[in-house]
Amino acid sequence: STPSNSSAASDVYKRQDGTDNFPAKFLINDACVMAGKPFSHAGIIRFKGQLMTYVPGEGPCYRCVFKNPPPKDAVPTCKQAGVIGAMGGVIGSLQAMEAIKYIIGKGDLLTGRLLTYDALKMEFHTIKLPKDHHCAICGDNPTIHELIDYEQAECDMHK
């Protein structure tokens, strides 16, 4: 069920996650889940990208899938790993299409599915994602009731 076009537009345009660090991704997820607002997650690193959409009551949230942010230095920063600019264009365009589909109420959203893209192989895959009924934010008995401020190294693009 898609809300009216005007309410859908205000929901989607304010909640597109293309951030470059896990604390921000979890903060966006948690804030949207608490507010009952949909959002789209996207991430890239090197030649790979991923995308999923969360709609309240229609599938898993980001935390259902990824549980908690990784330890502070467990995942390389953008500077360490590298980001291919064209990947932002590919995944960003797909994320924009998710917003358009939501707004106009057409097509199948990536709710309950993670779309992955491997640019080196030119392959897309869709992974079915179940809702975690034990999820700390959207599960049957949530344990997170306020936003958490995680700390992690930011993607330093200026040095």
Task: Name each region found by the language model.
Residues 1-13:
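Single conserved hydrophobic/aromatic residue that forms the stacking wall/gate
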Residues 14, 20-159:
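Glycine-rich phosphate/adenylate-binding loop
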